[in-house]
Each structure stands twice: as C-alpha cells, then as structure tokens.
Amino acid sequence: MKESAASVAVRPQLREVFERFPADAHRTIEDEIHEMMKCYAFDDAIFLAELHYETDKSNNSESLLLYADCLYRANKKEECYGLLSSVKLSGARLFYLLARVSYDLNKIDDCRGALFEHDDGVIRKDILEEPRVASHANLLHAQMLCDESYMDLALESCQKSLDENILLWSAIITYLRFGGHDLAHTFEKHHRKSNGLYLDSPASSLKSETPSPNVPGPSSSSAASTAEPSRLESSVRRSTRGTIASANRETRNTTSNITPRQSTPGSTPSRINPTAPRKSSRISEMTTRRTESSVTGSRSSLFTEPERPHTRATHSSRNRANAALNSDTENSNASNTRTRSGIASVTRGSSSSQRTNPVRTSIRIADAAAAANKTAKTLSQRRRNEKQPLVSRNSNLARSLSGSTNSVASTASERPSEDEVSQINPPLPSVASSLNNDEPMDIVDGVYDPEYKKLFDVYQHIALIEESISTYNWRSADALFAKLDRDIILNTSMVRLQLGRACFEQSEYRECRNILDDLHKRRKWKVDGTELLSTSMWHLQDTHALSALSQILTTESRERPQSWCAAGNCFSLQRQHTQAIECMERAIQLDKRFAYAYTLLGHELIVQDELDKAAGSFRSALLLSPRDYRAWYGLGLVHLKKEQNLTALTNIQKAVNINPTNRAMLCTLSQIEQQRGQIDTALVLIDRALTLNPLDVACRFNRSRLLFEANRNEECLVELDKLKASSPDEAFIFHLLARVHRRMGNTHLALLNYSWAAELDPRGEQNITDSNVINREEYEDDEYGSPV
C-alpha cells in the first residue's frame, strides 16, 4: 500500500514535467536528436536515435543514418562500424559513412567494399549521383590510393573531389602534396559550373611531377643535366589557359537569366597538416653560428606597425668587403635586382666587436606595404649584406653534409631577390593573371551573396598562395601575399601560418620565429605551426625559448603530435638524441599520417648512426608526402653515409628537381660530384647555388675548397682572400688559406694563417674532418713544400 501511494504521488509530478515540455506540432524526433547533438548531449542523442531506429519502420534508412551519425560523432566508431556492417545498406551517405569508419579503424577491405560496388576501383553509382557525398568519397579514395603508392591515381581522385566541391581545403592540400598544379583552372571550372555554363576547355593534365623511387635520376656525368633541374620542373607547369579575369568577364555576359543560388559546402574533414620540413642543417655535422640580429624591417613588423616606409640602409666598412666579395660571381643583371630595406645590428658570438650590416627585408612585406600605401616610392637599388657564419660553436651539434669533406652547409641564409630567382622559378600559370591584375579574383555577381562572395575570394587567394608555397615558387608567393588586405594578414591564422612557412622554407628562421610566436601568443589554443616554430628556435639555438614552448605544449596539448615534435627539438638541441627519438616516435603514435615527424625522426636516427631505421623513416614520410624534398634529401644522406654515392646522387637530384632553390642540397650535390672526380660539374653546381645568394659564405667556402681540390691555387687564393675580408672570424677560412699557401711554398704565410686559425678556434671545435682529408692534407713536404 505504501508503494502504491508513492507511485500515485509521483505521477502528477511527472505529468507536470511533461506538460511543461514545449509543444510544437511541426517538430519531429529528428529535430530533437539534432538539437541534442548541437548541445553536445551525445549520449542522450544516441539513446533517442536508437529508440527511433528500433520503432520507426517507415523510413528505416534515414533513422539508421541518424543513429550511426550519432555514434560516429560520439567517437564510438566500433559501435558505428558494427551497426552498419550488420544491416543491408542503401543510400550514398550510409555507404560513405561505413567506408569512412572502416578506414578510420584500418579495415581497408571493408572500406573498399562500402566505397566500390565491384572490385574495380569505381565508386558506387549511388555515391556519384550525390555530388556533395561524391567529393568526400573521392578524397577518401585518394587517401587509400596514396597508402597503396598509386600517386597518379590519387592525384586524379583529388581532382575529381575538387571538381565536386572546391571548398574542401583538405582536398586542396592533398592535391598539391601529390604534385597537382594549376588551381586557377580548377576554380574557373567551378565558376562556370556554378553558373550552369559548359566548360569547353579540356581538363588540366594530371601528370604527376613526383619522381618514382624505381626510376633512376638524371645522369650525373653532364653538368647541364645536374645543374639545371629547375627548367624541367618549371616547364611542366607552363600552360596556355586563359586567366580568371577573362573567364569571369565571359560569364558575366551570360548570367542575366540565371536564378541566383548559393552553394553550401559539405562538412569538411579535419585539415591535413602540410608537411613542414626541417632544413638541411638538421642532419649536417656542422651547423652555422646564428647571428643575434634585430631586423627592423622584418615580416614580424607587419603585425605590430600599421605600415613602414622603405629606408635606405646605411653602409659601414663591412660593405666594402662584401662588395669585393661579389665582384666575380654576381650576374650581369645583379646590379638591377630589387632588394629589401632594413638595418640589422649583427653581433658575432666569437667576436667582441659589433658590426652594422644592411639586412634586407622580404619582398612579401615590401610589396604588402607598397600595396597598403599606393604613394610609396620605388624601392632603392642596393645589395643584401647579411652573411652567414660557417660553423656552430657547439661541437656536438656540428654535423657536416658530407661524411668525407670538411664542407659547410648554409642554413641561416637569405633569399635571392626577385630578378635573381625569376630564372629559377617563374610565376605559376595559375597565378600569372593575378600578378598583373589589380582587380580582385572575384566570381560572377548575382550568383552568390556578398558575404559568401567575399569569403570565396579570400579562399581562392589563399589556395593560390598554398600552391605557390607547395611548388617553392617564391616570386608568385610574394606577389600574392602583397595583394592580400592587411586585415586578412593580421586576423587570419592560416595566412600567418603560410607566411611563417614561406620564411621557414627560405631559411629566414628569425622572421619565421617572430611570426609564428606572435600567432601562438595571440591564439594560445592553436597548436598548428608550433612544429615549425620549435624548429626555427632549434636553428637559432634559442634553448630557453624552445624549452619553455615545449613545456607549455606537452602540458596543455599532450595529445597533439606537434607538441612532441617541439619536445624532440628541445632534447635534440641539448644533445639528448635518445630522448628526442622517443618524442618523435610518440608524435607518430598520435598521428601516423604526420609526415614531418617521420622526417625529424630520420634526422635524429642519422645522428645516432642508425642508418637503416633512418632510411625507413624517410620512406614512410615519402609514402605520405611524395613531394617532400627533405625526405628525398635525407634518404640521399643515408646512402652518402653508407658511401653509396650513386644512389645518394640520384635521391638528392630528385630533391633538387622538386625544390631547385635550396642551396644546401646543391652544395651536397657538388660534394658528391667532387668525390666522383667531376670537379667541373661540382663547380657548376656551386656557382648555381651562388646565383641564388652571392653572399652565402658557406657556398663560397665550398667553392674555394673545390678549387683547392682541383689544384687551381691562384683562383682559390683570390676566393679565400675575399672570404677573409668578409668573414674575418671563421677559423675554417684561415685553415684552408694556410693549406693553399703551404702548397704554393709560402711557408711563413702558411704558419701565420695556421696561427690565426688556432686563435679563432683554440679547442678545435670547428676542425671536423675525416680521415681521408687528414691523410691527404698533412704533412707531405713533397706536395706542399714546393710551388705548384
């Protein structure tokens, strides 16, 4: 009786609760479930969806999709997979959801069965009939093909995905990562398709520029084939398609009767992190000494100052030495090159005196300032004067690019001017029209509302910048950055990250650190880009800042691979390479598709002389990003350490074909050619590297060493005298100068230069040579005791 009375007392309360529930005659159970998912009440949504699926027999496919969707969003992928695989499916979204969850669970056979009707690689007709689902299905197919190393087919699937939905950013990243190009033509097709116009131009060629690991590289016997891979790469990009502006003008004349409509992008998968490489000094046995310079005209000033005028740098006594350094290797057009403004006060770690050198600012910021201030004057014509030191003061971090020479890699180098680099990387066809057209890259008026149209214009512009960065075409990237509005650069994280990546790729580590550090401070919750920030600090040997960054990331974002890459960089800078390897492996465990972690792991394994594991790590990076030139370069260095020079030459040539603007790789190629006895070819490669930056001290030192190996003593002496005037605190220069004088019979000058080298490097930290050099160098009086 007591229980009955209690139940009677409760019933009115429940009735009152249900009576307070808002009644809406048009509201369905699907609306209630979606409302719960919007409020992140996934367990409640799953309960209602399961109840709805078990009781609704009229529209079982829709209720099944809703139930499976709730499970997937709640990260209950095993339950979602079990549900979908236990029933007969119908409909594009159900098949795609089963394929997606199977791929996430690494059930590739089930993924293929859901995606393809037959085992022929053709996506189901039901999926293809729904363009929004087809775009995601094609992208998933591309990822599967990439895992199976079918790069050309993966590129084609990415193109199909973009044809269906151009707003899939992950599809654009994947498309460029597989070697795609000419995004402007893809946007043009989207514009015409959006307006119901037939695209009568043929589809763009989908030929991949990715070199196959089974295809041998270009012959190294000829200097032309080795020294000019950039022409081959740039010729692939050339096309004769019309510009975006011309296509828009055509479509504006034919859209007067078209009903305005707005396409809505589908749910985009999480953005794939672009590969962010560590530069070549990561695996070199000697790193350059970083200068503590304050670049007043750097890119970072864009984020703190409204605009800055271009100033002419003051010249010091060092400029005369640098002018002498340039006299014999600069191109005839070098006097007309565009240069950058800014003054840097450079402090050498090994010298107590301070020297003021004019330092250039990036063309991107110079052009951006010119765009913001249309009345700005033309940039003054002058030379870059910032040099790079040869070696690091830390002997344990000093790693040479070659195991058999005492050469030096340049890592703290500056980017060539616009005219110098135009011969190497001409503007891409996809952005050629935007370089000469001040009008925004807009789409047809009347089809999209103004806000959508504005966002689409910015999206298209950012996509073209991504294409320029992915193809290492800095001239096009500079022009596109200059055309962006200042507010977009200041307030868009993706644009800042792209700007930081561009600085990082060109070894402008100080500017990269300033840009990405400012981004991290403004948006502390964002982790993307911190792997580049930590690597920039590694190059600058900023131990305290790197330690603080890694501490913050590993505390607040332990489940992100970028955090453990930063921790690995921190341990590597402190020469704790075993702990660094553990951190990189942890990053790979968190994200098995993070190619940058594989690259860093390979570099650390090279330092530990675990060459087979390092090669496997680089190959894993190439599976994920076949155009990652750092992975090709690292693989070449592994073979170089194994003294497999021909295989190393082939791999490094592939890296140069992908990125022809990397001077360190050209120096390494020249060292391999020198070991093979091809001195002339090696000199051609060094001269090509010097055309990118005539003031690169490391490249010039390598050129002097090659002249010494070729017994061209007079030319070597002239080159070293110029280097001595430009870099009077580098022990390597005086050491090689002493060897030249000894060979020429100038014993007193040889002893004098040996003495200066010992004063600059009393503990021999810079004296990193192998046994071959020692046996060949010292003390053979019959070779060095008489003039040659």
Curated annotation (Swiss-Prot):
Annotated TPR repeat ranges: 561-594, 596-628, 629-662, 664-696, 731-764
Coiled-coil boundaries: none
Family membership noted in the UniProt record: Belongs to the APC3/CDC27 family.
Effect of inactivating the gene: RNAi-mediated knockdown results in defective metaphase to anaphase transition (Mat phenotype) and embryos that arrest at the one-cell stage.
Keyword Cell division: yes
Transmembrane segments: none
Keyword Nucleus (UniProt): yes
Chief location of this protein within or outside the cell: nucleus
Composition bias type Polar residues, residue spans: 241-273, 293-303, 319-360, 391-414
Biological or metabolic pathway of the protein: Protein modification; protein ubiquitination
Tissue/organ expression: Expressed in the ventral nerve cord.
Quaternary structure, from the entry: The APC/C complex is probably composed of at least 12 subunits: apc-2, apc-10, apc-11, cdc-26, emb-1, emb-27, emb-30, mat-1, mat-2, mat-3, such-1 and gfi-3.
Function: Probable component of the anaphase promoting complex/cyclosome (APC/C), a cell cycle-regulated E3 ubiquitin ligase that controls progression through mitosis and the G1 phase of the cell cycle. The APC/C complex acts by mediating ubiquitination and subsequent degradation of target proteins. Developmental role in early embryogenesis and the metaphase to anaphase transition in oocyte and spermatocyte meiosis and mitosis in germ cells. Required for embryonic anterior-posterior axis formation.
InterPro entries the record matches: TPR-like_helical_dom_sf, TPR_rpt
Residue ranges of the region described as Disordered: 198-436
Feature: compositional bias, Low complexity: 217-229, 366-378
GO biological process, one term: polarity specification of anterior/posterior axis
UniProt-recorded name of the protein: Cell division cycle protein 27 homolog
Gene Ontology cellular component annotations, sorted alphabetically: anaphase-promoting complex; cytoplasm
Cellular compartments annotated: Nucleus
